[in-house]
Amino acid sequence: MQEQYRPEEIESKVQLHWDEKRTFEVTEDESKEKYYCLSMLPYPSGRLHMGHVRNYTIGDVVARYQHMLGKNVLQPIGWDAFGLPAEGAAVKNNTAPAPWTYDNIAYMKNQLKTLGFGYDWSREIATCTPEYYRWEQKFFTELYKKGLVYKKTSAVNWCPNDQTVLANEQVIDGCCWRCDTKVERKEIPQWFIKITAYADELLRDLDKLDHWPDTVKTMQRNWIGRSEGVEITFDVKGYDNTLTVYTTRPDTFMGATYLAVAAGHPLAQKAAANNAELAAFIDECRNTKVAEAEMATMEKKGVDTGYKAIHPLTGEEIPVWAANFVLMEYGTGAVMAVPGHDQRDYEFASKYGLTIKPVILAADGSEPDLSEQALTEKGVLFNSGEFDGLAFEAAFNAIADKLAEKGVGERKVNYRLRDWGVSRQRYWGAPIPMVTLEDGTVLPTPEDQLPVILPEDVVMDGITSPIKADPEWAKTTVNGMPALRETDTFDTFMESSWYYARYTCPQYQEGMLDSKAANYWLPVDIYIGGIEHAIMHLLYFRFFHKLMRDAGMVTSDEPAKQLLCQGMVLADAFYYVGENGERNWVSPVDAIVERDEKGRIVKAKDAAGHELVYTGMSKMSKSKNNGIDPQVMVERYGADTVRLFMMFASPADMTLEWQESGVEGANRFIKRVWKLVYEHTAKGPVAALNVDALSEDQKALRRDVHKTIAKVTDDIGRRQTFNTAIAAIMELMNKLAKAPQEGEQDRALLQEALQAVVRMLNPFTPHVCFTLWQELGGEGDIDNAPWPVADEQAMVENTTLVVVQVNGKVRGKITVAVDATEEQVRERAGQEHLVAKYLDGVTVRKVIYVPGKLLNLVVG
């Protein structure tokens, strides 16, 4: 065995061995318990970043541990390969998205291999290949036939100059990111999948997900947003149609003083015909961004339409306003306003001088003070005619019943969740498999014409999708009739909603899934990824699973038993101010820092001598130039060190602070393990361990070994606190390094201990452990070695620690046999020099002994 630890030599050798032996390739095996460990698949952006490395290291540790427990472990990987960034990069690099994407996949695959992740590469998928998306297209046509897919117009961000649709992130300050033209909201026909048909089940089944973080479940509950309320119909003077609104607070109905409609509502459009101010307002609303998050914070504005609605219970006339906070896509595009008891309505009414009528008493029974803000709490009604004196529930029911009786209201369950719009007016995505005949009939693409293949050899002009720009591409025939293909492509969340299931049978040609394989592996046992996916991806992922279940492909209700959301990776961030006052961010690698005695950064400069401003730790990002390239770190320290640091520096679900000093520490620890194994094996063969012949000290050391095995097993398996597992192994290593190596049983004990340490470290640092296991004479490859099992007998304490007090003050601690008598304990206490000096020349008047815990000597 080499004396020096050289990761650059051993890691490539071990990786080659895994490749040749196909160590991590698995097939279904009914005789073994399965374990499906999955990390969210990466987007092939070009290079791995530390966030990827953290996610995949956690997954690999879990997979390798479960494999050592004897389970049949599936850990696949693939590429979420469609999407907008490829289009931008293709234009910038004067290429097409396909070659750019495939080059990135090849590069990143190599990076994943150098990190030693134990993937079953035979199952690798790239979502941009027709072999993959053909099944998604077929499934979509089946959903269409089931009535779960429909087309309707929906608002998008439209750049009038480029004549193209923009994603929300391509709208900068209301303008197109490319040409700076003012962006408009435009209604265009788009395809939707009816996720709302599954809203109740998606909500209800969250209760089955015991091993998902509560934060994620709460976010999904809020996003689905189930509410119970009443739908109320208003007559409008001089308008042909009625207005319908939905409210969850019918108890406040007698305080409704105006209605608000969306700028796009037919009533507003009609009123604008002879109202220039309203027409201008509608125009302004058309140019606001679609993003819902921005709706909440923007200034609330409106214009009176001049129409008056009739309050169905009081008969009063109340004004109808057009307002920018009402969206056509949500509900009916009209809301009732109760400014006394809703803060948004209150601010709007205050701004435009509209009536504010209180109808709920304050908690103390007095009339509410509405001079500053609305009273939003529930309470007892007043100012409400026959409903005065009723509390929330009674008022809700009485008013709902009264409205129903008059034929102007009905109870409704509503959802905040909207159907999933899957159309994207982009090129680099899977074509939507629908066609339109010359007479306007819309049909799904016939199965014998699937897949609809996206042409990859295209020229990107940066504006129009090549398949929209080429009229020939859309032409096809269906049943002998000319037809035009849909030129929109799928939202890329489509591909990532079912990839986990395709991994179970990636070569299957008869359909989307091989049910036998899918039901052997599914559900996923642990799914690892960032919390930023809580609502979009993780909701679509659950939805698709239910769709596949209802199509008879899978039997489980949910796709993943456990969800682990790893924390972000942070790094130091520095900048200097340039000549024009701009911030120039400098990589932490290039910052020369001075620290105080506590290790805090107090001064920094770069190689060019710029004084740097230190802004603390923040998420690694391109914008702050504080990403650390994993490849550089692997070249400097080896993959095992990077992996060990990632798992040791912080609990998996908390943020991780990248500190190179910590990486160096992880590297030193691996070298210490290497050194101890080297010194141990250099002394030649080892005798068999005879546990009955061990001395007390040897038994105590063996107890530490087996207690560590028990703790590490619990930390990795049940608690998933990987950092504390590593800390326990480090603590044991310190004891082993100090243990005497005189007799043959000393060496036999160290042999047992090191074989356990190397197996416990294997999930974290598999290359070095592969090598050390061979050096220690372990049987076969460590990849097939069983996880060490703690010996219950070895862990039994035969000694105990007794606290010794003199006159009630602690004067020392002594180790005694578990079954020691009071006399033996007293005698041992007298030999303890820290205690003895307090007993010198005094008489012990009384002895208080709590067996195995405390000895108190009362002296005088």
From Swiss-Prot:
InterPro entries, sorted: aa-tRNA-synth_I_CS, aa-tRNA-synth_Ia, Leu-tRNA-ligase, Leu_tRNA-synth_edit, M/V/L/I-tRNA-synth_anticd-bd, Methionyl/Leucyl_tRNA_Synth, Rossmann-like_a/b/a_fold, tRNAsynth_Ia_anticodon-bd
Top-rank lineage group of the source organism: Bacteria
Residue window of motif 'KMSKS' region: 619-623
Ranges that cross the membrane: none
Chief location: cytoplasm
Motif 'HIGH' region mapped to chain: 42-52
Keyword Iron-sulfur annotated: no
EC number(s) given by UniProt: 6.1.1.4
Record's keyword terms, sorted: Aminoacyl-tRNA synthetase, ATP-binding, Cytoplasm, Ligase, Nucleotide-binding, Protein biosynthesis
GO molecular function: aminoacyl-tRNA deacylase activity; ATP binding; leucine-tRNA ligase activity
Cellular-component GO terms for this entry: cytosol
Record's keyword annotation contains Transit peptide: no
Chain sites annotated for binding ATP: 622
Location(s), subcellular: Cytoplasm
Catalytic activity, reaction form: tRNA(Leu) + L-leucine + ATP = L-leucyl-tRNA(Leu) + AMP + diphosphate
Entry's Gene Ontology BP terms: leucyl-tRNA aminoacylation
SUPFAM superfamilies with a match to the protein in the record: Anticodon-binding domain of a subclass of class I aminoacyl-tRNA synthetases (SSF47323), Nucleotidylyl transferase (SSF52374), ValRS/IleRS/LeuRS editing domain (SSF50677)
Family note: Belongs to the class-I aminoacyl-tRNA synthetase family.
Protein name as annotated: Leucine--tRNA ligase
Organism, as annotated: Salmonella typhi
